[in-house]
């Protein structure tokens, strides 16, 4: 879980656009961010297993 101070700091619009970093919308994690879904890989995996992300299914072959 990300620090609350970092999440609050990130929610404000930065003075310069380059300073903005992507964070997971669920847990606030800055690493392993998936831009298409707006969340980190861990939250993506949990929601995909539960079937809460439309169009995403577990691969089997």
Curated annotation (Swiss-Prot):
The keyword rRNA-binding applies. Pfam families: Ribosomal_S14 (PF00253). Signal peptide: none annotated. Its cofactor is Zn(2+). Keywords: Metal-binding, Ribonucleoprotein, Ribosomal protein, RNA-binding, rRNA-binding, Zinc. One of its GO terms (molecular function) is rRNA binding. One of its GO terms (biological process) is translation. Binds 1 zinc ion per subunit. InterPro entries: Ribosomal_uS14, Ribosomal_uS14_bact, Ribosomal_uS14_CS, Ribosomal_uS14_sf. One of its GO terms (cellular component) is cytoplasm. It comes from the Bacteria. Belongs to the universal ribosomal protein uS14 family. Zinc-binding uS14 subfamily. NCBIfam families: PRK08061.1. Part of the 30S ribosomal subunit. Contacts proteins S3 and S10. PANTHER family: 30S RIBOSOMAL PROTEIN S14, SMALL RIBOSOMAL SUBUNIT PROTEIN US14M. This is Small ribosomal subunit protein uS14.
């Amino acid at each position: 879980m990300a620090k609350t101070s970092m999440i609050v700091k990130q929610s404000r619009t930065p003075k310069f656009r380059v300073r903005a970093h992507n964070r997971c919308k669920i847990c606030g994690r800055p690493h392993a961010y998936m831009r298409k879904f707006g969340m980190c890989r861990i939250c993506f995996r949990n929601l995909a297993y539960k079937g809460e992300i439309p169009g995403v299914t577990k691969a089997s072959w």
